[in-house]
């Protein structure tokens, strides 16, 4: 493993609290340093930057999966129960149903959102459990969507855009693959390029650091992988007890610290990576 055990700890334990942090899947960091995550009953939680308190800000009424902030500070949440992407206007607390998919092609399992530099939202669609299918949608700022990558994927999951916006990394969970899709000059999707195969692992959430390393939260086994730009795969940290890392899913950076959600328990984990994460959304203006 690349990291010693003392670099990994529980950031917030919501097992017995009120509100209870129930099996969080998505995690995102706001510009004020607060850490946001979702619950299995649609709750949207905000944790103070130091992890000392939690507030249920809003709810989709469904099951929250991946989430991402846009440049204005609003939070976008993929919801499995409603098969939709919701938008939380953070300033007012209002939740709107933002997108249901493309005309004639609704979302099936919208799983993970990622913004590009001009405010378009890429959304993975996991299709169906056990049935490969397309793919990745792209949603305009006004909510209009297209099926951007229409090739079959075996459970498209986490997404991460390269710093220059030239390619989109995708976790293909049930094939144990990571691949990238070049974004052509006209904005269309290129052909997939394999990044790494991680046999025995179920890759879920993705994040990138400023050196171009790709970080992968793995639902099984409970570990985070790091893949360098050459495609070398290392285990950043593995929890053989599935206790501190308990089936981690999504991962998000705040400076050199990474936060992981844990679908298997009721807490968030903090990992001191030691390398600055790529600030999101990508692009100039920070």
Question: What is the role of each PLM region?
Answer:
Residues 10-11, 55-59, 96-100, 147-150, ...:
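Beta-propeller fold detector
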Residues 16-32, 39-41, 60-76, 103-121, ...:
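Beta-rich, blade/repeat-based domains predominating
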Residues 176-177, 196-232:
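Loop/turn-rich, solvent-exposed surfaces of beta-rich toroidal or solenoidal domains
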